[in-house]
Amino acid sequence: MQEEFIMKLQNPIFRGFDDVFYAPHSRHSTVLKEDIISHDELEVISEGDECGVYMVMGRNGREFYILGHPEYSPGTLDFEYHRDLSLGLNPHIPDNYYVDNDPGKGLLVRWRSHANLLYSNWLNYFVYQETPYDIRNIK
């Protein structure tokens, strides 16, 4: 779980968000910011100090690419962490996920409200309000 910063607060996708929010991230994949900004049609609109890029906007503001996992249920990271332990791996304890970063103290869900806002803002501002009634009129 990494802390994210909003860089484009005026974008309706972030309406209702706090200035800083948390989001689950996979520890097995990375997309470098340099690779994203090398494409003129893409813009980084949210990132964190530790995790890097979280959200990218493209194609005239109608497409969003999310590099974290706001869809994760509360126990997903816990399941993955304990699964890897049982396989004899030495996984990193997910940051900011357990109370006091201690798996024995229980979960601390910090991303649920942002995830709900993200999906409802996307549906409201970028699907319902921007999609023509006649789908043949989409540009």
Question: Where do the protein language model's features map onto the residues?
Answer:
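Pocket-forming structural segment of enzyme catalytic cores
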Residues: M1-T76
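Acyltransferase
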Residues: P70-K139
